[in-house]
Design a protein with these regions (language model features):
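Class I S-adenosyl-L-methionine
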Residues: 6-7, 28, 36-52, 61-125
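N-terminal Rossmann-like NAD(P) cofactor-binding module of classical short-chain dehydrogenase/reductase
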Residues: 56
């Protein structure tokens, strides 16, 4: 299975899929922490458009999480940053759905205008 892990530079998720025999790649604006040749440093949009069986996305959560309401809520100085982040993330998710058979997005409880299909806690694994 061809797997893209977007917005990931640690390589942890990519390597877990590679160990299972999948053709897994990561992509982020930052270089890979592990220096892997299976990491694409750059904008994930053109990489998503290459077509994948599975895309897992880890968009930056700073402005997207409810825990940031104190700084990013309505009327706060960083509210526009939150709006921009929501628009970018939802656009990325819609793009991924067009170019992959399956799409997953990891993020803490947030403010995105889409309903989560499931919640998974780290202690469950």
């Amino acid at each position: 299975m061809r797997v893209l892990v977007a917005c990931e530079y640690s390589g942890k998720v990519r390597e877990a899929f590679r160990k299972l025999g999948h053709d897994a790649w990561s992509c982020d604006l930052l270089p890979a922490d592990d220096g892997s040749e299976f990491h694409i440093q750059g904008d994930c949009v053109p990489v998503i458009m290459r077509g994948w069986d599975l895309i897992i996305m880890h968009p930056p959560c700073t402005a997207l999480c409810v825990s940031g309401n104190r700084w990013y809520g309505r009327g706060m100085p960083k509210h526009q940053e939150r709006i921009d982040s929501i628009e970018w993330t939802t656009g990325l998710f819609e793009l991924a759905k067009q170019h992959a058979k399956s799409v997953a997005m990891e993020n803490p409880v947030g403010v995105l205008p889409m309903k989560a299909t499931q919640y998974i806690q780290p202690w469950q694994f």
